[in-house]
C-alpha cells in the first residue's frame, strides 16, 4: 500500500528533527531512520498498529517519545507526527 505524507505531518517531522539536531545530531539521525523504517513496515502492515484517539485514525509508536498518526483509506495518509506527551486531538 502506498504511504503519503500530508504536508502538515512532514512539517511537524522536520520541526522535531531540527529541534533534536540542534542538541544531538546523532539522536536526530537515529529518529529519522527509525521513522523511515517504520513507514516501510506500515506500508506492508497498516492495520497492525493501535486504533487512534481520533475517529478513523491509527497510532504507531515509532520511538518511546514519538507517535505517527495515520489513516488507512485507499492509501496510507500520514496525518501527524507528535511527541508522546503532546495532547491531541
Task: Please give the residue ranges for each predicted region.
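Absolute protein N-terminus
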Residues: 1-2, 89
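Conserved strand-loop elements at the edges of beta-sheets that form or border functional pockets
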Residues: 62
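Basic, Lys/Arg-enriched alpha-helical interface segments
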Residues: 2-57
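Enriched for short, Lys/Arg-rich terminal
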Residues: 66-67, 71-89
Amino acid at each position: 500500500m502506498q504511504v503519503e505524507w500530508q504536508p502538515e505531518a512532514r512539517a511537524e517531522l522536520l520541526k522535531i528533527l531540527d529541534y533534536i539536531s540542534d542538541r544531538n545530531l546523532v539522536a536526530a539521525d537515529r529518529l529519522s531512520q527509525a521513522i523511515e523504517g517504520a513507514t516501510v513496515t506500515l506500508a506492508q502492515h497498516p492495520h497492525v498498529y493501535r486504533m487512534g484517539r481520533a475517529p478513523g485514525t491509527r497510532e504507531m509508536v515509532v520511538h518511546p517519545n514519538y507517535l505517527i498518526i495515520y489513516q488507512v483509506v485507499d492509501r496510507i495518509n500520514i496525518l501527524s507526527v507528535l511527541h508522546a506527551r503532546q495532547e491531541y486531538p
